[in-house]
């Protein structure tokens, strides 16, 4: 019997005011891969991502984590297992270390400072632990947001165009460091992007989304050719 994928959707649909934002989406994300959800603005990419960790409720269909229907998981467990990195970072008041350790601190868990510093090092933030979060550049703040999500040790990471709000140089650096840390930690991720070059740099397989529906899925060449 084959092992269940870390994340899969089955006929996932969300309808709001009669409009299908996401319609009948069935995908599988394999272990240790970056699965790209590709498509133009307004195609339903972020709407799909919000369904994957139940920030929004599906009208029909569901999501499975390692074969378990995510409706059977309590919200706190689900949020921990499925991490989210938004387009624009929102940091709490405090130091970089306090931001990264925010999740374990809220849960009353001990903070693994060695792992925290290793994560900062891998994201190009060596020596940043004691800096105030409100004194960082946009690229630095986004890397802290990535570190905060990864420090929770999620099973799957959702990346909602994590470099789209940055200038070209900062975006390139974030993407390069993100690719390195994803490989180093053997992470499984879903990346939303409208940028074909970004998809090729970071992704392994993917799906093309148009008007909320999957129009192509599989290897990235197939998916990106479908958008030409």
Question: Where do the language-model regions lie?
Answer:
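Helix N-cap at the start of a conserved alpha-helix in ABC-type nucleotide-binding domains
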Residues: 168-170
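ABC ATPase NBD coupling module
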Residues: 69-83, 106
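Conserved ABC ATPase "signature" region
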Residues: 111-128, 179
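Helix-to-loop junction immediately C-terminal to a conserved catalytic motif
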Residues: 53
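Catalytic Walker B motif of ABC-type/P-loop ATPase nucleotide-binding domains
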Residues: 157-161
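Conserved catalytic motifs of ABC-family nucleotide-binding domains
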Residues: 153
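Conserved ABC ATPase signature
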Residues: 132-136, 140
